[in-house]
């Protein structure tokens, strides 16, 4: 055996799962669920009683947290569903580039330059107007299943 046999390529992903299992019957409204491989927020849950052949079923109506599309799924209540790990992180806005990207300041003092402006026109307008007025803006970034998107803007200027 040579040393090459024990060599592996490291990647940025540490191999942590992007989802965790949860029994369908325990997922509630305003929780999260993966439907059609998309992270969603549950807006409605209804349960049907056990029928002649089998399990009680949970009917989930959910909204994709990144694109706002409505998705539905029906799962036996005793089965496990994938639930995404959803995180929200706040960053300070440093710059908005011409090509539609933002430059953000992380807690550790580094810059994060790989995030595009969101599709929400009102949010983009709020960001651009605040930035041009010289306000200190904090952007909330939602992260789930390897995707990131700006979801909120806060002005922390303090009466400038």
Curated annotation (Swiss-Prot):
This is Eukaryotic translation initiation factor 5A. Translation factor that promotes translation elongation and termination, particularly upon ribosome stalling at specific amino acid sequence contexts. Binds between the exit (E) and peptidyl (P) site of the ribosome and promotes rescue of stalled ribosome: specifically required for efficient translation of polyproline-containing peptides as well as other motifs that stall the ribosome. Acts as a ribosome quality control (RQC) cofactor by joining the RQC complex to facilitate peptidyl transfer during CAT tailing step. Lys-52 undergoes hypusination, a unique post-translational modification that consists in the addition of a butylamino group from spermidine to lysine side chain, leading to the formation of the unusual amino acid hypusine. eIF-5As are the only known proteins to undergo this modification, which is essential for their function. One of its GO terms (biological process) is positive regulation of translational elongation. Residues 1-23 are annotated as: Disordered. Belongs to the eIF-5A family. The modification Hypusine is found at residue 52. Keywords: Hypusine, Initiation factor, Protein biosynthesis.
């Amino acid at each position: 055996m040579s040393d090459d046999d024990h060599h592996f390529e490291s990647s940025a992903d540490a191999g942590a799962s992007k989802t965790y299992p949860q029994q369908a019957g325990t997922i509630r409204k305003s929780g999260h669920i993966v439907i059609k491989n998309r992270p969603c927020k549950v807006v409605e849950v209804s349960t049907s009683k056990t029928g002649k052949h089998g399990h009680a079923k949970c009917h989930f109506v959910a909204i994709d947290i990144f694109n706002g599309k409505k998705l539905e799924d029906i799962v036996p209540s005793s089965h496990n569903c994938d639930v995404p790990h959803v995180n929200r992180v706040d960053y300070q806005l440093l710059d908005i580039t011409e090509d539609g990207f933002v430059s953000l300041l992380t807690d550790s003092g580094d810059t994060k330059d790989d995030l595009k402006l969101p599709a929400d026109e009102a949010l983009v307008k709020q960001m651009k107007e605040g930035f041009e007025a010289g306000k200190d803006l904090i952007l909330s970034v939602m992260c789930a299943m390897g995707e990131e998107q700006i979801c909120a803007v806060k002005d922390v200027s303090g009466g400038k």
